[in-house]
Curated annotation (Swiss-Prot):
The active site is at K22 (proton acceptor), T25 (nucleophile), E75 (proton donor). It comes from Vibrio atlanticus (strain LGP32). Belongs to the N(4)-acetylcytidine amidohydrolase family. Keywords: Hydrolase. GO terms for cellular component: cytosol. The keyword Glycoprotein does not apply. NCBIfam families: PRK04980.1. This is N(4)-acetylcytidine amidohydrolase. Catalyzes the hydrolysis of N(4)-acetylcytidine (ac4C). It holds the Pfam family ASCH. Residues 7-95 form the ASCH domain. SMART domains: ASCH (SM01022). Its EC number is 3.5.1.135. It is an enzyme of class 3 (hydrolase).
Amino acid sequence: MTAPTTMTFFERFETDILSGKKTITIRDESERNYQPGSVVEVSTLEQGRVFCNLKIISVEPILFYDLGEFHAQQENMTLDVLKDVIQDIYPGISQLYVVSYELV
C-alpha cells in the first residue's frame, strides 16, 4: 500500500499542533500506513485548509484500554477527554495506532 502524503485534523486541534503541544494523533486501521521519515501536508477536516507540514516519526499499534496519561499529555488533553474524543470519532474501537510527528 502507498504511504499517505496528507493528513487531516479537526480545526480545534490546529493551535495545539502549531504550538508543538500536540505531538501525536491516534487513528484507526485505515490510517495506519503513514511511513516514518515521510512528510505529510496537513489540512483541516472541515474546510480542507492547509496549515502545516508534519514529519512522521513513528506509527505504533495500541489498544484503546492501554492508552495512558503519557498519550493524553502528547495529545494535550486529559486521559478522560482523550478517551471520549476517540470514542466519538471511532465508536467501540479497540485497535488503534499512535502516529508520532514533528512540525517541519
